Amino acid sequence: MLKLLKHELLSSYRPYLISLMVFIGVCLILPQFSSWIGIYEGLFSVVFIISTLVIFFTYLNIIYCFYKSMFTKAGYLTLTLPVNTREVIFVKLLSALIWLAIASLVVKIGTKFLSDAVIITYFENSVDKLVGLPQITYTNYYYVFNSLITLFFKTTSAILSCYFVISFAHTNRIRKNRIASAIGIYFIGLFVGAKFYDLLPQIMMSWLWFSAVFEICLSVLFYCDTVYLIDHKLEME
C-alpha cells in the first residue's frame, strides 16, 4: 500500500505544486508593493482571495485526479492493479488529505509571513477561518481536540462524497452528460443534507461530539458506497 501511495503522490503532484508555487510567489512579492496599494485592507483582500483560490483549486485537483485515474484511459490500468478497490480508494483519500494538509500549511505560513510584513493584526485569523483551523482563544484542550477531529472528518466526508458522486455518475443509471450529472447530483445532495441537518433534534445538536460522529458516519457511508459502485456497478466509457 505504501508503494501505491507513493505512486499516487508522484503522479499527481504537478497541479498542486504549480498552485502552491504561485501562492508563495505572491506572498513574497506583494509586501514590496504594499505602499502602492495605499491601504493594508487592499493587500489583505488580494491575498485572501488568492488563498481562497489555492484551497479551491486543491479541492478541484483532488476531484480531477480521482476522475482521471479511475474513469479515463488511465482507469483501466488502475482497475487492473493487484490490489482491491478498498485499498485504491483509501490510498486516493489519504493522498488527497496529504495534499490538502500541505496546501493549508503553505497558506498558513504564507499569510503569517504577510501578516508580519504588513502588520495586519486580523489577517492571520481570517485565513485560519478559510483553512478551517479552530480558533484557540483559551487553553481548552478537550475542545481543541474535538474541533480537530470534526475538521478532519468533515474534510474526509467532503472528499469521499465527491468520489461517490463521480462513481455514481459512471454507473449504468447515467449514460449521458456524466460530468454535468455528477455536478447536479452533488449540489442536490448538499441541499438535501443541509435540510436534513436542520431537522435534527436540538438536544442532539447540543452534544459536543455530535458533529464529529455525524461526519464519521458520512465518511464510512460514502467510502463503502463508492467501493460498492466501483466493484459492482461501474460502466466504463
Predicted regions and their residues:
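Hydrophobic alpha-helical transmembrane segments of membrane proteins
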Residues: 1-75, 85-237
